[in-house]
Amino acid sequence: MHKKIYLSPPHMSGREQHYISEAFRSNWIAPLGPLVNSFEEQLAERVGVKAAAAVGSGTAAIHLALRLLEVKEGDSVFCQSFTFVATANPILYEKAVPVFIDSEPDTWNMSPTALERALEEAKRNGTLPKAVIAVNLYGQSAKMDEIVSLCDAYGVPVIEDAAESLGTVYKGKQSGTFGRFGIFSFNGNKIITTSGGGMLVSNDEAAIEKARFLASQAREPAVHYQHSEIGHNYRLSNILAGVGIAQLEVLDERVEKRRTIFTRYKNALGHLDGVRFMPEYAAGVSNRWLTTLTLDNGLSPYDIVQRLAEENIEARPLWKPLHTQPLFDPALFYSHEDTGSVCEDLFKRGICLPSGSNMTEDEQGRVIEVLLHLFHTVEVKKWTASIR
């Protein structure tokens, strides 16, 4: 059997060992140290914000943002429905209530139309949310300027979940820098990785300092161990920060490679009937973290996942909308249009293809060959049925 092709595996640069060795030589192996400080500073400079706090995951970063915005039990938080569950889980950590917002077709991300309707209704009912979490899916920025403008009009802060979009640019600004807070993920499948890790960023330096405090068990600066509020064990280790520094050095290369992979897929498959790739919104440049497409040719995403799996190739359906997940039942949901849910339609028809930046042309050729054969077989069956 062929070597397995994964959806988005880690891609080491070769420089990671240098920084790991530095951490061991200096004995800075705890969740603090000079490499943590350097990683925070370099990431903040890279995206153009004043401050950043390195933490154990993107989920932890979202949780800290909610803590900083004083989200409490019973408060509502508006959240994009079309996303991974980690976006909304921290809302439940604080016993708040998620209200889900549909996507729109241009970006597949939060619909400003649905958001505006939700905000208008919440204002009438006196239940404005404590925060809005917008997500940049598969590397593509949401219409962040419109979303932030709407939320500003209602006095609601925005958390930008840029877990999948580090390196993406929208209207000349780096992804993750539009809201009150932005978050990034460095999970093993992301465009750069620290094995597990995340970053909370903001232009509010005092808030980021408070985030570091909360992420360090909220330990107060006393000789003895003193704590006056709930804290968390969320800090990133100095060793993993070293991995992050090495990865950040090759971010531009990783973006270029993922965009090349997308282009190769589109050139090979984009002409086929019923195959439509995730559009790139005109105002942005996506990092194309994952190549995604929708099908309208008689095949389901599960047909493709199964066929590729038979060839030892990993693929997955798009995210299942959170408002349809049992965890959040019953869930309040605002759709983009009266005729139905955009994100539910995308989920039913969409698929993610292998997109790792260390995938070779030959490996991608294998994926394309299997898909072309599968699509051709479907067309032949349709043609045969039509002449009977």
From Swiss-Prot:
InterPro entries: DegT/StrS_aminotransferase (IPR000653), PyrdxlP-dep_Trfase (IPR015424), PyrdxlP-dep_Trfase_major (IPR015421), PyrdxlP-dep_Trfase_small (IPR015422). It is an enzyme of class 2 (transferase). GO terms for biological process: polysaccharide biosynthetic process. This is Putative pyridoxal phosphate-dependent aminotransferase EpsN. Keywords: Aminotransferase, Exopolysaccharide synthesis, Pyridoxal phosphate, Transferase. The keyword NAD does not apply. Pfam families: DegT_DnrJ_EryC1. Induction: Repressed by SinR. The modification N6-(pyridoxal phosphate)lysine is found at K190. Belongs to the DegT/DnrJ/EryC1 family. Its EC number is 2.6.1.-. May be involved in the production of the exopolysaccharide (EPS) component of the extracellular matrix during biofilm formation. EPS is responsible for the adhesion of chains of cells into bundles. Its cofactor is pyridoxal 5'-phosphate. Signal peptide: none annotated. GO terms for molecular function: pyridoxal phosphate binding; transaminase activity.
